[in-house]
């Protein structure tokens, strides 16, 4: 059984971020960002996270799953103030769910991460209300409810 968590790194210092990962005994961090090197926090860059997790968070493993990130086009649309999706987040959620069903390899999530007890989904948003990791978590629970339980937002 996978305990699934969510975390965003913005508004957290490196000390806070890695402290949370360590305190919650996270075995594997799954990065679900489209651009894992384009963020403001240097500690969250793709090439640095595996080292920091290994050294500062009890050997936590790192895996980038770009197929679970919203596409560039979908992100552009939700950020464009003139698009309906930017005003109604449910439209984004529906489009992202469709993307996960048709263009991702979501079906192998349990197979790939089932060897870990505590897994966290990472993206940049500080909370998950308007973040794709919440939608992804919900979908994983719907698809794999016997193999995954939601542990919470970190």
Where are these regions (language model features)?
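Residues lining hydrophobic/aromatic ligand-binding pockets adjacent to catalytic sites
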Residues: 1-154
């Amino acid at each position: 059984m996978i305990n699934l968590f969510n975390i965003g790194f913005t508004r957290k210092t490196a000390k806070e971020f890695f402290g949370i990962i360590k305190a919650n005994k996270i075995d594997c961090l799954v990065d679900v960002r489209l651009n894992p090197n384009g963020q403001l926090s240097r500690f969250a860059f793709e090439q640095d996270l595996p080292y920091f997790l290994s050294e500062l968070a009890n050997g936590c493993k790192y895996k980038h799953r770009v197929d679970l990130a919203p596409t560039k086009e979908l992100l552009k649309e939700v950020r464009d103030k003139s698009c309906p999706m930017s005003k109604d987040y449910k439209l984004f959620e529906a489009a992202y769910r469709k993307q996960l069903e048709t263009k991702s390899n979501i079906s192998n999530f349990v197979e790939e991460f089932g060897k870990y007890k505590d897994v966290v989904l990472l993206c940049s948003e500080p909370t998950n209300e308007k973040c794709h990791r919440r939608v992804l978590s919900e979908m994983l629970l719907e698809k794999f409810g016997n193999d995954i339980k939601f542990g919470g937002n970190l």
